[in-house]
Design a protein with these regions (language model features):
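N-terminal active-site segment of His-dependent metallophosphoesterases
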Residues: 1-65, 70
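Active-site-proximal beta-strand elements of phosphoester/diester hydrolases
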Residues: 6-18, 131-141, 182, 247-253
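Divalent metal-coordination and catalytic microenvironments
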Residues: 13, 31, 43, 48, ...
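Active-site environment of divalent metal-dependent phosphoester hydrolases
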Residues: 17-20, 51-54, 78-90, 142-145, ...
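Metal-dependent catalytic neighborhoods of phosphoester/phosphodiester hydrolases
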Residues: 19-23, 47-67, 85-104, 193, ...
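His/acidic metal-ligating clusters that form di-metal
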Residues: 38-42, 133-136, 148-238
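Extended active-site neighborhood of metal-dependent phosphoesterases/phosphodiesterases
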Residues: 61-174, 267-272
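Binuclear metal-dependent phosphoesterase catalytic core
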Residues: 121-128, 216-223, 235-288
Length: 288
């Protein structure tokens, strides 16, 4: 393929359960298909990798997933959703499992952990030059005040986005324009789909964002380097809208052991230096 092309596979909402049943096996089949057919350079798991509520040994399930992913020639990156740490394990426990058992985990840069939620960057390199920065932010799980259902990105992480962008500007003396951001829970701004009316893809359920808007989108606009954002969480959405020059996308639900009417799949993102990224939804033909 193209030497300067970097491909990213977004796997979201795999929802692997503790019983290794037929549904989970299909999820593993989907992962295998996507890895072997598309051979992504980087694979980003955008949350709800596992079920954990009432699961005694969710750590074993997560370890199995990490070990399974070791067989592929890709770099693994993760963030967490609202279902990964509802049991005994904290996010720090899941990160420890990644550290211990994942042999192809991506190099994290500029890591900042706030309330056990991590933000970090991935540096995409072409010909010894960093051409893109991928920002990964853990948006948490449930609202700490019981306001609505879901958590919001912490102000410290919004500030981190500003400072980290500044650090890259200073380090490279270069204006990045094609960077991306990954998180689990959609921002409130995704709701603009209802006002814009113009979108690509499927919009089949209300946007399950936080009731609190902590201003991440305003910082994305101010930085001016982020061209696209990707989340998961809403299994019946996979649309993209262009909001004030930033494309906001859902992935495609990948897990069989969970709700949702969409054909299971993933999202493929293609990066090239000095070009707008390309992205498409991939479906897994699971009829056989």
């Amino acid at each position: 393929g193209d030497e300067t092309m970097t491909t990213i596979l977004q796997l979201s909402d795999l929802h692997i359960g503790p019983h290794n049943d037929e549904k989970d096996q299909k999820t593993y089949d989907l992962i295998h298909h996507m890895m072997t057919h598309y051979q992504p350079d980087i694979t980003v798991l955008t949350g709800d990798q596992i079920w954990s509520e009432g699961v005694i040994d969710s750590g074993r399930v997560y370890k199995k997933l990490m070990e399974y992913l070791n067989r592929y020639d890709t770099q693994i990156a993760t963030t967490f959703g609202n279902h990964d740490t509802e049991g005994h394990l904290k996010r720090s426990d899941l990160r420890a499992i990644e550290d211990q058992y994942s042999t192809n985990y991506v190099q994290k840069n500029h890591s900042l952990i706030v309330d056990d939620k991590e933000a970090y960057t991935i540096e995409v390199v072409n010909n010894d030059t960093v051409t893109h920065v991928l920002y990964v932010i853990d948006g948490g799980d449930y609202n700490p005040f019981g306001i609505g259902d879901y958590d919001f990105i912490r102000p410290e992480h919004v500030n981190w986005l500003r400072e980290t962008h500044q650090a890259y500007q200073t380090r490279f003396q270069h204006n990045f324009q094609h960077n991306l951001l990954f998180t689990h829970i959609p921002l409130q701004e995704y709701r603009e789909v209802e006002n814009i009316g113009e979108y690509h893809g499927i919009f089949n359920e209300p946007i399950a964002c936080s009731k609190i808007n902590s201003g991440l989108f305003s910082q994305m606009l101010l930085n001016g380097d982020i061209e696209g954002m990707f989340c998961g969480h809403d299994h019946d959405n996979d649309f993209t809208i262009n909001l004030y020059g930033i494309r906001l996308s859902f992935g495609r639900v990948g897990g069989y052991n969970t709700y949702g009417d969409l054909q299971r799949g993933a999202r493929l993102i293609e990066l090239q230096p000095d070009a707008i990224y390309k992205s498409k939804v991939l479906e897994f033909d699971d009829r056989f």
